[in-house]
Amino acid sequence: TCALPILVDHAREYIEDNYKRPIFDRIMRATLAQILPFDKRFRFAMKSARLVKPLAPLMPSKIRNMVDFAPKKIPVPSLNDKPQVFPAEGKCIKRVALMTGCAQKALDTDINDATIRLLRRHGCEVVVAQGAGCCGALTHHMGKSKQSHISAAKNINAWMSELNGDGLDAIVINTSGCGTTVKDYGNMFLGDPLENDAKTVGSLAKDITEIMIDLGLKVSSTSAVRVAYHAACSLQHGQQIKTHPKTLLK
């Protein structure tokens, strides 16, 4: 979300390819790149971290810090994350794909579940596309372009298949960092055979707040609730979405 994102992306890739990091850092980065983008692996890693927490004081500081961050409770996988179609409640206004992501599916399944319920109540048919998964942001930010492009290409192919089939009005994303990355797929795939499809997918990508502003949020209760709102950098700078979340909360 820096002012010169394309230059930063090139720099990350160049550093990854040309700078020889200390061996421990290389192992850590390679391990994270093979775990975080895969929800089942990430879930297994978190469960393992809980088991070894008593041994944390004996571990190197970097590993100890990660073990300490392991949540006490890991949610049960949601059946809603499997490829399927959820019909709209009442008249169907839009047909949208939901990006279920990767790490989020392991850390907090309620987010996708709530998003599906909200969209259906507002007249959206919600598609969880076969083959879609991690947006590629995690490895992209590490400068591991090959890995990030593999993840992104799977999403592009999955969503284009839906678009060319029964059609899509939008690709809904409820994680701002992922949304920033998907909207930038066109730049990521410049000069690639997938460039045109990547641009199409990027143009369809919408943050959940953009969709809800368009649909018009219907609330069942008018009782006042006091909340704290965190304006994510990737949302307000990366996507230039600054007022939608606050408007919806009000």
Task: Describe the role of every protein-language-model region.
Residues 6-250:
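Iron-sulfur cluster-binding electron-transfer modules in prokaryotic oxidoreductases
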Residues 2-4:
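Short, small-residue-biased leader/transition segments that mark boundaries at the very start
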